[in-house]
Amino acid sequence: MSSPNVLIGDPIKKDSRFRGNDKSMAKKINLTLKIWRQKNCKTPGKFEIYKTQGIDVDMSFLEMLDVLNEKLTKEGKEPIAFDHDCREGICGTCGAVINGQPHGPQRGTTLCQLHMRNFKDGETLVIEPWRAKGFPINKDLSVDRSAFDRIINAGGFISVKTGQAPDAHSLPVPKENADIAMDAAQCIGCGACVAACPNGSAMLFVGAKVSHLNQLPQGAPEKKTRVLNMVSQMDKEGFGNCSNAYECEAACPKEISVVHIAHMNRDYRQVNLP
């Protein structure tokens, strides 16, 4: 195999074949951030304005907040609280509304995977937490999403026999059902659907969890009680009803379809038939 034609003693970075787009890598932008600050859910909050300069366009949105928090800490000010964990778009922990859009302007992307190149130099960003009765504010941009955990506890599980693992293909699953279940299982429980819905409804989240399990034979034993208990718990948590605005599907970082709400409604009606 022939080696690259690079002069001995010259750093590889001087060869254009080993270098990225210098213009893109060097680009910096300045932003005005209008961020919601609130001590807790019992105290009133307000917007505070921060000027950020020299933000690398290749940063993620959360990395930009890290830079801002480091600056605030050095100045002896309270850093901005926000939820985050894996920063890989998997866990569903992060989330904020940017200029009225949950997770920001890029479709099918979580906040932690949103890059600053999606914004323009000199732009003003209004950053708010998820706003819904079922998501009380912990602090600043951080909200309490334990309501989702309680909905899962109400029926988002299956019953299995203990002991040895079952043989492969012992429970045949039609491909159509498997595809529907896999699509629904992509839900990471971030809450963007609730934040986007004008009614603060959690129907897409609950529909995805119900559809995921009810499509599979493993979920059959609790199929009836699952949909009843999870919908009932959703109502108890104070989430609104679905009015087919479809904002949930548009905001979902995994682009989960509202067809799963239809599947849940179908199962719910079948259980309640005389």
Language-model features: locations:
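Intrinsic disorder/low-complexity segments
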Residues: 1-25
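Eukaryote-biased recognition of intrinsically disordered, low-complexity regulatory segments
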Residues: 28-50
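Short strand-turn-strand beta-turns centered on an Asx-Gly dipeptide
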Residues: 36, 52-53, 98-100
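Short, contiguous acidic and Ser/Thr-rich linear segments
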Residues: 48-59
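Ferredoxin-type iron-sulfur electron-transfer modules in oxidoreductases and energy-metabolism complexes
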Residues: 59-78, 126-274
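Short, structured protein-protein interaction patches enriched in aromatics and acidic/basic residues
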Residues: 81-93
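Glycine-rich phosphate/adenylate-binding loop and adjacent beta-alpha elements
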Residues: 98-122, 127
